[in-house]
Amino acid sequence: MKLAIKETPLPKYIAIEGPIGVGKTTLANKLATNFNYDAFLERPSENPFLKNFYKNPSQSALATQLFFLFQRMQQIEELKQRSLFETVRVADFLIQKDRLFAEVTLSNEEMDLYDKIYEHLIIDAPTPDLVIYLQAPVDVLMDRIGKRGNPNEQFLTP
């Protein structure tokens, strides 16, 4: 009797998701380093609205969300430009989750505007072949956030 083993192809695009402080960027970097993947990482330090958002979410939510949306779309364009045959790409964000976060943070009027922009931009976003969702208890997340010492995140509460 002969046993047939079917090889599963490697995913070409991996997205890692989860709450802040769970280790998305850490895992993406480890995968990129250990397996020679291309990493596409969130760059929250570039968002000039984030500090104010953490202090008072309602005042800076739309600007913060739109900045991240445009930043992620730029990264998605870079991702799409790379040949599917070159290497595996790993991202510490899932563009489809962006809208879910917006629903929680934006007013109805802001959400209407966000939706119009989102729908226009997301048309060609690739779908990941694999999504890894990380979880951790809230106390672990808060401990990790505190340990990384980002001054913008000092205002976060559970």
Task: Label each PLM-derived region with a short phrase.
Residues T33-Q71:
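Conserved substrate/cofactor phosphate-moiety recognition/catalytic segment
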Residues I16:
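Hydrophobic anchor at the beta1->P-loop junction of P-loop NTPases
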Residues P19:
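P-loop (Walker A) phosphate-binding loop of NTP-binding proteins
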Residues K24:
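Conserved lysine of the Walker
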Residues L27-A28, A32:
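Post-Walker A alpha-helix
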Residues R72-E109:
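A basic- and aromatic-enriched beta-loop-alpha substructure that forms the phosphate/nucleotide-
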Residues M1-K12:
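Extreme N-terminal, non-catalytic leader segments
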Residues D98-P158:
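A glycine- and Lys/Arg-enriched "phosphate-lid" helix/loop adjacent to the NTP-binding pocket
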